[in-house]
Amino acid sequence: MKRKSFSFIALILSCTLLFVLQFAVQPVYAAEIPYIQKILDRGTLKVGLPPYTTPPFYYNDLKTGQLEGYDVEIARDFAAELGVEAVFDRDSASFNDLVRRAGAGDFDIAIGKLGTTYKRMSDAHPHEYMNFRHAILSNRKSIAAIQGNIPDDEFAAVLLESKMRIGFIANSAYDTFAQRYFPNAKRIGFKNWTECKKALFDGKVDGIYRDATEIKKIVYQTPSLSLDYVPILFEDVIDQKSIYTSTNAEVQIGSVLDYFISREVKVQSDSQIMESFYDYYRPNI
């Protein structure tokens, strides 16, 4: 009886040992790419986001206070594909500063309707995920004075060479674009988009300059403005919106980000965005 008990106990111990050894030799998942392993060890994807509010791209929900938006969800989805959560840094001083900090490695990626310029590409590496037409919202009287009898199909070139007063957000891509495309204009940078719009409505500038989604949003939400102001879209001048990475991140996860964009996001135009987020562009009632 004792021998049987001993044999039974030995069998249990043997099975237990085999069970333990089975799990002990199971490989622990580790990424071969060091940068991805660093993200996994940290448990989060660090994401830089502009210090502004720009629905439907990034904003705090009025009811919950939670950070929401198209760009926010892209960042969260990318983080989820890597097996971590996204954490957001909104402490940059401006759009340009955000890109600079991305290049310096303050976060893994920077997103937030960030335009692509040569200056920014000297700071960080861009990955295009949207492309929007350039646009201006201008006072009708100012435009009429510049156009005169010039046919509409010839007016764009004349407008770009004009001496109009044009407003934009300082230290943004449109600060750079204004210098390039409006060399003769009086260019005035403002702290934010609200101040830009106020300057236009107060008559301090003849037009304000940004991408089509922001210009068309103004007249879509308040149709009565079209009596005095006219949106002008430049069909052949495109603002390529990019997600930015540092050189270190680019070398190790740039291809992963491109794969994610091509499969899960796909490059969106301003028309596609406005159709997808109709609620943000419909008239205020």
Please give the residue ranges for each predicted region:
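C-terminal segment of classical bacterial N-terminal signal peptides
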Residues: 16-27
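A ligand-binding cleft/hinge motif common to bilobed small-molecule-binding domains
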Residues: 96-97, 113-122, 177-180, 194, ...
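Periplasmic-binding protein-like
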Residues: 51, 130-138, 143, 212-261, ...
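Short helix-initiation/N-cap motifs at beta->coil->alpha
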Residues: 73, 87-100, 153, 188-202
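Extracytoplasmic small-molecule ligand-binding "clamshell" domains
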Residues: 30-113, 121
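Ligand-binding clefts/hinges and TM-proximal coupling segments of bilobed small-molecule sensing domains
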Residues: 30-32, 163, 168-182, 186-188, ...
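Alpha-to-beta junction loops
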Residues: 45-46, 83-85, 103-112, 164-165, ...
